[in-house]
Structure formats: C-alpha cells, structure tokens
C-alpha cells in the first residue's frame, strides 16, 4: 500500500539507513560507552515541594545533582512519544509471550502436527503470496509458468543435496533442517557477542594467566569429581560477570570510608580475610582464589564490591544488580532500532502484573494471590539455587521469567526482601552472614548474566525441547532421523542452548541478509500499520518472498516499527531497471541460496499461520468454556436465589407452625386443668363408694364363711362313704380276678391237651399221605418211562410226547375220586375237631407232613433227578430259620396234588419248545387266592416226599427258566376246559402251599403285589366258627418276595375260603383275552423266613412306611369290624357341611369306643385303610401323621374266595361234599372268616 504521508516516508527512510549502518558490522555495534549506564536523574522525594527553578536529584551512583526543571512543550511531546512507543512495544511483547505460552501449552501430538510440513503446502504458500503481492514487471505481471517450474527445480536440487548427505532425509526433515539454519545463524551472532565480551575479560586477566588458569582448572576438575564439576565450568563465566559488573556499577561508598576500613585492619589480615572469602565465594581452587585477591587489591572497584558483600550483607550489591538489569535493558534497546522478539521479551520485564494477568486468562490477580505468587517464586528460586555450582537447577522457564520480572518490576523492594528472607531461612544455619551475602550476590549475578547475554534465553530451553519433541515424533514414525550435520555447530562457551523452532515463528527477514547488488529491485510492502494500535495481524504479517528467477526481493519491514514503506527513490527507479535485472544472471549457487531463503520464509509463514490458527482455536474454546462457566454461574445464582426463597418460605411456615403449636399447647393445658378437677371429684366419689362397698362385703364375707363351714362338713361325710364303697369294690375285683385266673389256667391246660391230640392226628395223616404219594410217584415214574420209550427209539429228543396226553388224562380221572375223598376228609376233620376247645390250631399244620418222616435211602437212590429245578420263590432268599424239612414236605405235597394237571401242561409246553412266558401275579412266590394260579414250576416227575436240608439249601439258590403254567380254570391252548375235579386239585395244592386266606387291600396297608397269603402278617383274628386263635405271624426281614408287574391285571380277592361273595369264575372267553403274566425274577421282595413268627417288620421296597404292625387284637373283634368302626367314627365326628374334611388324628382316636386299641395299632389300621377306604393323611415336618380324611363312599367289599362256594353247602342235604359249607357254633381263630356257624 502507498505511504500515508511524505513525512512518514522520510522517517522510514532514516530508520532504514540507521539499520543498514548499525547492522553492517556487528562488532562495531558494541559501543564501549554503552557499557556504562546512562545517568537519568530522578526526584528523590516526589511528594515534596521544590523550587520551580531547580530540583535536587540523586544519580544511580549515589551522587547528588541539581538540575532545572524542564517545562517546555518539546519535552512533553518527547515524553508522550516515548510513552506511546513503550506501549506499542509492550503490546507486541505481550502478544509474543502469549504465543509462546500457547506453544508451551500444546501437547506433543499437536506440536508434531504443526511442525509436519509437506512440499505442496510450501509451494501453495509461495503461489498464494505471488497472487496477493504481484509486481508490475513484465515477468511477474504475466505470471509465467517458468517461475513455478524454477522454484520446483531449486527445491528438488536442495532436497537431493540433503539426501546425499543423509540418506534418511524426507520432506519433513528437509523443511526442519532449513529452519534450523536460522537458529544456527542466531547462535553465531551470540558467539560474536560472547567473543566481544571476552575482550573485557582479557583486559582484566593476562593471556598467560588465563591459559594457566585453564590448565589448572582442567587438572583440578579431575580431582574434584562431580561436586566441583559444575562450579569449575562456571568459573570463567563468574569472573567475566564480576568484571562486567565492575565496569557498570558505581559503588555507593566513598573513598574515605574505604580508606578507613583499610586503616582499621592490617593489610596481611585483610588479605587473609579476602582469601577466605574468595575461596568460599569465587572458587575453592587455591590459584584462582590467589589470582582474584591480587587483582582485587589492584582494582579499588573490585575491592569495594568485596567489602560490601562481606560487611553489609550485599545490600549495595543488590542495588547494583537492579541497576545492571535496568542498564542491560536500555543497552538492548539501543543496539538496533528494529525491535525483534528478543527486545520485545526484554522490554516486557517491567510488567509483572500484566504478565501474571495474561497467564491468568486475562483476569487480574488479587493482592493476596499476587503476594503468594511472589513468595512461592522466591522460595522456589531459593531451593533451586546450588551453592556448589553457583547456579539455579531444575528451574522452569516460567519461574525464571517470573523471577526476572519481579526483580525489575515496580514492587522490586518487597520481592528483594522476600528473596533475602528466604535465603536466610535456608542458609543461615549452614553459612555465616558473609557467606550468605556472597551466595545472594552469586545467585543474582548468575540470573542477570543469563538475561544480559541472551535476551531470548527465556525461550531457549523450550525451543530445544520443541525440536526434541519433533525428533521423537520423527523417530516414532521412522521418517526422520537425527540431524547430525545440522547439530554439529559449535555451541558457545557458556553452553547456551539454541533458540529452536520458536525463533522461526518471530522471524521477519534476517537483517544480516545482504541484498544482491543488481540494478533491479522490487520492494513490496506487505502491511500498513496503524499508529494507534498493533494487532495480531501486524505481528504475524506477510513475509516478503523474493522472486528468485527475477531477483525480486520482497521484504517485509520490521513488524514492530509501525507503518514503514520503501524509499521513494527506489520506487521511481523500478521501471528503468527491469530488463537489466533479468540480464544480470547469477550463478547456480546463488540461485540455490536465494531459493533456500525463499523456502525458509515460506515455511516460517506457514508455521506462523498454523500457530495463529491454533491460538485462535484455543481462544475460541476458552471463550466457549468461559461462556459455559458464566451460564453455569448464572444458573447457580438463580438456583441459590430460589433456594433462598424456599428457605424463607420454609422459615415462615416453621414460624406459623410454632405459633400453632403454642396455641395447641395452651389449649391442652386448659383441658388438662379441667380434667384434673374432674378427676378429683371422681376420686372423692370413689372413696365414698369404696367405704360403702367394704361394709357390704364384710357382711357378705361372714355369711360365706358360715356357708363354707357347712359345705366342708358335708364333704367330709361323703368322702368317708366313698372310701368305704371303694374298699368293697376292691375286694370284689380281687375275688373276680382270682376266679378268672383259675379259669384261664384251666383253659390253657385244655388247649395244651388239644394241641397234643391234634399233633398226633396230623402226624398220622402226614404218614398216610406220604405213603400214598410215594405209591403215586412210583406209578407215575413208570408211566413216564413207558411213554418215553417210543420217542427214544425213534430218535425224538422230547421225553414227553403229546401221545401220552390220553394216558395222563386217564390217570387223572382214576385218581380223582381218591384225592377228593382225602381232601374232604381233611377239611371235615379240621371243622369237626373240638369246636368248643379254647386251644387254637392251624389248618396248615394238617397239610404238612411230619418232619421225622424221611424217605428211605433206597427210594431216594431210585428217584430220577429233575433236569430243571425251579426255585419256588423265584429269586427269593430263604433264610436258614425256615424249617427245610417242613418245606420239603410242602413241596412234595404240592407236586402230588398238582400232578394230574401239571403233567399234561408241561408235556404240551415242552413239546412246543416254549420259553418262560408271562405268568399270573404271585405276591410272594406262592399260590394265593388273589392270584388264582400257581406259578411254581413242576417237573414231569414227582419229587421225593422228603428232601435233605442241605440239598434244599443248595437248590434254593439256583434259578432256571420256568415252564409256563396255565391259569387256574383255563384250558391249555384255549380248546379244553378242565373238569371240576381238576380245579379242586389245583385249589387244594394252592391251599396246602400258601394257606387258607389272602388279604385284600381293604384289610392291609400294602399294595396288591405285596399282600401276604396269611392276610395281615402281624394280626391275629378270631371268628365264630373257629375253635381257637392263630398265633401272630409276621414276615421277617431278609426274606425276598416275588414282585408283581405293574401291568398285571388284578383279580378279585378273597378274605375266606368259606366266603360266598366272590364273583363267579371267569369263563373261557373272558380269560382267553387277558394277558396275565408274572415273572419271578423281575424285582426283589421280602418274605419272612418263618410265617408263624411274631413282632417283626416288613422290609419290602414297596412299603410306604416302616410302621410296626399292630400287636395282638383282643379276641371277639375281627379286622373288618375294626376298620368299619374307624370309618363310622370318622363320619360321626366330621362336619356334614364339608365334603371330605381333615380330622385330627388324636380326636379320631379318642372317639373310638369299645375297640381297646393302643395308638400304634390304631395308626397301623389307618395305614391299611388307604386303599379300600380312600384314606388320606396330612403329616408335619417330621413325617408324623397329624390329620386324616376319608372319602364319603361305601368301602370296597371284600372278595370271597372260591372255596367259600365249594364249602358253602357242606351241611346241605342236596349239596355235594364239595359244595357244602361247614358250620360251627363256637368262635374260631381263622383269619379268613368273619362269622360262620358249624353243625356237628
């Protein structure tokens, strides 16, 4: 843009000329006079009244001067201009520091993203700049493509050169290497400055002395190891610092005071004192300390400084430090008119509050917070100072910056006191006052030296860290390696670090860069600044990019100088030198150098734009967060306001509630007073009534005592009468018991005699039966042998032929009359034997042979041994307690009685080679009336009547397939019906093997598959037709009982062989359709070893509970009568409105009258009623029965046995001997008869 006025152009031209002259020779820019601070007079007492003509001032060195007060307008204008310039510089410095702080706040990943610059991005920056800032020359105006091609060629050439040096170079590393060159050039300038300052040291020490000291220092370092290593590295620097301070500081003490001090102490003692102080403060090396003492004695300034440190605790030295910092700032501002980032940083040192406000997000700190910050910085710097190395360690850049600003700020005195107090607190115990003062001086000198030597050192560490961060990023991505060639530059003597990437962020265009000497130059001003303010856009201004092919140097003037334009003379000569510029060619090296610088500027501009974009983005986030916080604060205030109102309302409500409570309390007190008065009246009335009541009760008591006395006399008389009556009854009872005992004794004797007679009769019958059976067996054996001969001769293996069936049938018909006669005789003998005798007998005893009747040895040797002996009890185990001889007789008798039937069936079955098939249910492996069949396997031949016990025991454990037997009364094969004689034979065999009775489900508590053939095995019954009672019988544990399959169809049960209520015999058609099966080997059941034993338990897996069976029931009450009585009692006491209510078991037991049952027997009877009476129980947690319920229906009637029909008409004249029924007039002990009569 064109300049605003001619005066400004002239001003800019003069500034440009000054910059050229100032930067032409860096060594000449250092003026020795600048080392001496300028004396600026100031008012000693600003509030005092001074004469208008003059004013007394104090110089920095302590001298008093008198000057007139300047009141002219020129001075005011100059002051205003200086103030304006200072504000502009402060604002620019504040912005620079803000950007630096923003860079430090970025994460490593964000820094890497910003530093990652691609090739296309660099060229885009150059193209965009050319579009915005095009010159008026022929080449630039035409925007020829050759410029872009030339820049790309130069870029590729430079990249290839770096690639040759470092094969691992990539575009990103190449860009960072170009930027690194700016950092190297800056370090070179600092090295030049250090070498210039080194001349001062040479003036202080001779060259030979310096060389010898260096050798001694190197030798001494090897001995002192790590503790003295850092101190020796800083020895030369400390010496230089002291010399520099001596040249810039005026001591406050006058020469007279110094001479007085010297006169007070002898030279020798003073020198020794100085030597000790030097060894402590300067260096512990003896030669260095001695050299320092000698120089100190030669130069009064050094001596005065040392005395101040030793005597006044360094107060004068502190003032000197402040003056040095101030003078250093003034010197830095005078070195160059162009204000760089270094100067901006140094001029910003006087603004600690503004700096802390910026760090606090624009919010000023309070006085307390500011004081706390100063105290923390003072303590932190005190703790970080190392007395051995005389340097600060582990101090962050921010803490260093704050320390420098506080030391040069407006409140420097208070901060200085904090520093002194902190140092005293830490080192007072370790060091003396002189050493403490020396330590303070060394601390401040170290800090000031770093500030004076490099005004940009507050950023150096962070810059190096930034570059290191990117190096780490490059190593991780395997794209960038170490820049060995770039980092090989020598570092300064003080070991100062390089400026890093941040130096490029503030780079405008290097002032040391020499413009080429050719006639055509284009100066394009890129920004015009307002004189009133400096914005961020002015700070991050567009950098002038030189058009390399045409030698156009587009340079941006200094950012902080305001509006600066090119000189008019150069603008006027633009058109004359265009062609000459193109013709004046440069060699390839100059082209590459110019291209590298152009790329440097483009990368710098790109980094600046990225930093600004990141900064603005972060500011936007901060503003957004701040807005959210403000909104949250408003909500919080609103919520607090609402809560306050709510509390106020609650307080009012509480107040009203308390008032209401007070009113209620007052009302309650009035009511209590009324109640108290009322109670007093009632109490008086009660006392009066109580006195009256006592009088009445006294009279009544006397009457009661009289009446009680009469009753007691009458009671005594009645008791005497009752006692006499009981004595008479006791005598009567004893007489009756004696009579009863005599009768019982007689009855027992009669029973004993009766049993002896019965035993003799039974033995006789058994002997006869044995002889008859022996004959029948011999005849049958001979017949079988004869019948088997034809088959043997013809080669047929079946020993029994179907042709022998007619012979067997004839044999059966011939012997049927004799067998029937014997059975009738047996039954009549039982019915007619002593009906009035009280002794009991057992029908089964009549059918058992004597145990002493054994087969002769000869007959046993001639009997054939059966090939397949089946166990009569299936898989049952017969214990040794059973009388095997009796069982052998039982087996022989069964074989004899069933011979005529089983022989034919067996021959037919064996002929057809039939395997064991389904059999009828057999509860215990024996024949029963409920099963209607005998499942015992009968061999074709008759067994011997008596079998040895050992042989029976061995056969009891054998098992073999059983031959299928036809059901009782069923024809074999469905074509032949047995005669009545055959049925009687089968029934007789069943009767002799199993017993006379079977118990139905209504009279036992067990399932049909487990009922005993002797009815209830633990109960004995008495009937009217018996002559005595049976003994209690039970099944002992260990006896296995044959189970019944669940699929077997149950048949009608019979309770007595005399009962005539059974259903008619099934005809052929009904039974032929049924599949009645039973297998002895299905599952185990328990059977008693002795069916006559008592007081044992059933051990069957089918039992629902292990309840002991009832003991003996008193004679005269049979099973069905007991069960009916229990059921009727339940119906009587149960409520009628309920269908089937539960009744307590104790209530039912107490209402049973006349049965004489104990509780355990009662429970057993209830269990036996489950099936027939639909009885249900309710138990508690322990399993005990507590309640019982019966269905309201008629219990199932007891089935009548078939023998009841057979013997129902024994006394009928028209009946046959097998259709008559015996009668008796006395009670019998048959468990199967309810009530029968018998006639003689």
UniProtKB/Swiss-Prot annotation:
One of its GO terms (biological process) is negative regulation of translation. Its main location: cytoplasm. Residues 39-48, 488-513 have a biased composition (Basic and acidic residues). Changing residue 208 to G: In strain: SK1. Residues 1-20, 514-524 have a biased composition (Basic residues). Residues 25-34, 951-965 have a biased composition (Polar residues). Residues 1-76, 446-593, 634-744, 951-980, 998-1029, 1214-1240 are annotated as: Disordered. InterPro entries: Fungal_stress_NST1, NST1. The modification Phosphoserine is found at residue 266. Residues 616-777 form a coiled coil. GO terms for cellular component: cytoplasm; P-body. Residues 457-487, 558-587 have a biased composition (Acidic residues). It is found in: Cytoplasm. Keywords: Coiled coil, Cytoplasm, Phosphoprotein, Stress response. PANTHER family: LD36051P, STRESS RESPONSE PROTEIN NST1-RELATED. Belongs to the NST1 family. With MSL1, acts as a negative regulator of salt tolerance. This is Stress response protein NST1. It comes from Saccharomyces cerevisiae (strain ATCC 204508 / S288c) (Baker's yeast). The lineage of its organism: Eukaryota, Fungi, Dikarya, Ascomycota, Saccharomycotina.
């Amino acid at each position: 843009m064109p300049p605003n006025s001619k005066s400004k152009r002239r001003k800019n031209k003069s500034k440009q000329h000054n910059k050229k002259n100032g930067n032409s020779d860096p060594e000449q820019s250092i003026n020795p006079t600048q080392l001496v601070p300028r004396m600026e007079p100031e008012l000693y007492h600003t509030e005092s009244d001074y004469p208008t003509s003059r004013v007394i001032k104090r110089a920095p060195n302590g001298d008093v001067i008198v000057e007139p007060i300047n009141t002219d307008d020129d001075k005011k204008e100059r002051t205003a201009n200086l103030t304006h310039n200072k504000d502009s510089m402060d604002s620019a410095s504040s912005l620079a520091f803000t950007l630096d702080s923003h860079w430090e706040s970025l994460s490593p990943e964000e820094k890497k993203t910003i530093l990652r610059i691609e090739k296309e991005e660099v060229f885009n920056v150059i193209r965009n700049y050319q579009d915005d800032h095009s010159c008026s020359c022929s080449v630039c105006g035409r925007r020829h493509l050759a410029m872009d091609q030339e820049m790309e060629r130069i870029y590729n050439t430079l990249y290839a050169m770096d690639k040759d040096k470092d094969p691992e170079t990539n575009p990103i590393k190449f860009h960072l290497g170009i930027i690194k060159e700016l950092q190297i050039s800056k370090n070179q300038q600092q090295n030049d400055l250090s070498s210039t300052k080194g001349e001062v040291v040479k003036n202080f020490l001779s060259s030979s002395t310096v060389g010898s000291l260096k050798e001694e220092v190197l030798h001494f370092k090897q001995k002192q190891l790590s503790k003295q290593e850092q101190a020796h590295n800083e020895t030369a620097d400390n010496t230089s610092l002291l010399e520099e301070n001596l040249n810039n500081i005026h001591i406050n003490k006058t020469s007279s005071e110094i001479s007085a001090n010297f006169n007070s102490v002898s030279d020798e003692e003073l020198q020794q004192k100085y030597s000790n102080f030097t060894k402590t403060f300067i260096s512990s090396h003896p030669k260095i300390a001695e050299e320092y003492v000698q120089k100190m004695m030669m130069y009064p300034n050094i001596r005065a400084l040392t005395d101040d440190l030793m005597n006044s605790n360094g107060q004068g030295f502190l003032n000197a430090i402040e003056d040095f910092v101030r003078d250093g700032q003034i010197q830095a501002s005078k070195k160059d008119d162009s204000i760089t980032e270094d100067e901006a940083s140094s001029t910003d040192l006087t603004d600690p509050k503004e700096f802390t406000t910026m760090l606090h997000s624009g919010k000023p700190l309070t006085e307390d917070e500011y004081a706390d910050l100063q105290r923390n910085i003072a303590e932190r710097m005190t703790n970080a100072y190392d007395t051995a190395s005389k340097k600060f360690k582990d101090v962050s850049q921010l803490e260093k910056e704050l320390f420098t600003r506080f030391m040069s700020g407006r409140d420097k005195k208070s901060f200085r006191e904090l520093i002194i107090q902190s140092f005293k607190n830490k080192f007072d115990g370790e060091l003396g006052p002189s050493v403490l003062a020396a330590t303070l001086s060394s601390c401040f000198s170290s800090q000031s030296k770093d500030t004076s030597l490099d005004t940009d050192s507050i950023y150096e560490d962070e810059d190096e860290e930034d570059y290191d961060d990117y190096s780490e990023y490059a190593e991780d991505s395997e794209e960038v390696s170490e820049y060995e060639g770039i980092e090989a530059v020598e570092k300064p003597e003080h070991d100062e670090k390089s400026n890093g990437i941040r130096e490029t962020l503030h780079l405008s265009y290097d002032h040391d860069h020499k413009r080429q000497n050719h006639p055509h130059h284009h100066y394009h001003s890129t920004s015009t600044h307002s004189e009133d303010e400096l914005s961020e856009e002015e700070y991050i201004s567009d950098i002038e990019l030189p058009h390399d092919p045409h030698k156009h140097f587009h340079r941006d003037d200094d950012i902080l100088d305001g509006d600066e334009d090119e000189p008019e003379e150069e603008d006027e000569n633009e058109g004359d030198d265009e062609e000459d510029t193109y013709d004046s060619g440069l060699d390839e090296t100059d082209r590459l150098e110019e291209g590298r610088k152009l790329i440097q500027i483009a990368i710098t501009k790109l980094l600046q734009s990225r930093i600004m974009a990141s900064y603005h983005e972060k500011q936007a986030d901060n503003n957004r967060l701040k807005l959210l916080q403000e909104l949250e604060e408003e909500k919080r205030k609103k919520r607090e306001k609402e809560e306050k109102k709510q509390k106020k309302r609650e307080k009012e409500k509480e107040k009203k509630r308390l008032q209401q409570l007070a009113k209620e309390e007052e009302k309650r007190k009035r009511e209590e007073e009324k109640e108290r008065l009322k109670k007093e009246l009632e109490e008086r009335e009660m006392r009066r009534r109580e006195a009256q009541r006592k009088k009445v009760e006294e009279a009544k008591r006397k009457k009661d005592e009289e009446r009680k006395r009469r009753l007691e006399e009458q009671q005594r008389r009645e008791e005497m009468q009752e006692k006499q009556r009981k004595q008479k009854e006791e005598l009567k009872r004893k007489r009756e018991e004696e009579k009863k005992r005599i009768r019982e004794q007689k009855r027992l004797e009669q029973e004993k005699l009766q049993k002896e007679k019965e035993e003799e009769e039974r033995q006789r019958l058994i002997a006869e039966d044995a002889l008859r059976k022996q004959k029948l067996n011999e005849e049958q054996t001979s017949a079988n042998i004869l019948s088997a001969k034809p088959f043997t001769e013809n080669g047929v293996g079946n020993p029994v032929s179907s042709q022998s069936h007619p012979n067997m049938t004839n044999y059966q018909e011939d012997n049927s009359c004799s067998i029937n006669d014997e059975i009738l005789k047996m039954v009549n003998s039982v019915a007619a034997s002593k009906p009035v005798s009280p002794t009991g007998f057992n029908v089964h005893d009549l059918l058992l042979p004597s145990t002493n009747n054994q087969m002769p040895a000869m007959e046993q040797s001639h009997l054939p041994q059966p090939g397949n002996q089946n166990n009569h009890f299936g898989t049952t185990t017969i214990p040794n307690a059973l009388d095997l001889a009796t069982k052998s007789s039982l087996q022989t008798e069964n074989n004899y009685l069933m011979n005529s039937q089983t022989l034919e069936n067996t021959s037919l079955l064996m002929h057809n080679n039939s395997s064991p098939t389904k059999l009828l249910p057999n509860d215990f492996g024996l024949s029963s009336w409920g099963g209607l069949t005998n499942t015992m396997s009968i061999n074709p031949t008759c067994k011997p009547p008596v079998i040895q016990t050992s042989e029976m025991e061995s056969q009891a454990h054998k098992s073999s397939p059983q031959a299928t037997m036809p059901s009782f009364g069923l024809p074999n094969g469905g074509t032949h019906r047995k005669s009545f004689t055959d049925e009687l034979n089968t029934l007789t065999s069943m009767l002799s093997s199993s017993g006379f009775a079977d118990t139905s489900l209504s009279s036992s508590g067990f399932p049909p598959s487990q009922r005993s053939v002797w009815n209830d095995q633990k109960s004995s019954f008495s009937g009217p037709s018996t002559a005595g009672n049976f003994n209690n019988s039970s099944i002992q544990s260990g006896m296995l009982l044959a189970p019944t399959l669940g699929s077997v169809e149950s048949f009608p049960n019979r309770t007595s062989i005399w009962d005539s209520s059974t259903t008619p015999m099934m005809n052929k058609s009904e039974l032929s359709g049924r599949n009645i099966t039973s297998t002895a080997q299905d599952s185990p059941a328990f059977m008693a070893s002795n069916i006559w034993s008592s007081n044992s338990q059933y051990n069957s897996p089918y039992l629902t509970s292990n309840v002991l069976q009832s003991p003996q029931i008193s004679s005269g009450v049979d099973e069905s009568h007991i069960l009916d009585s229990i059921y009727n009692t339940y119906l009587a006491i149960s409520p009628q409105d309920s269908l089937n209510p539960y009744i307590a078991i104790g209530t039912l037991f107490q209402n049973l009258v006349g049965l004489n049952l104990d509780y355990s027997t009662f429970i057993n009877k209830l269990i036996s009623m489950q099936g027939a009476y639909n009885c249900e129980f309710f138990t508690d947690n322990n399993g005990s029965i507590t309640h019982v319920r019966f269905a309201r229906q008629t219990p199932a009637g007891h089935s009548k046995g078939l023998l009841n029909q057979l013997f129902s008409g024994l006394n009928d004249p028209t009946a046959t001997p097998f259709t008559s029924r015996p009668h008796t007039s006395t009670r019998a002990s048959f468990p199967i008869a309810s009530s029968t009569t018998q006639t003689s």
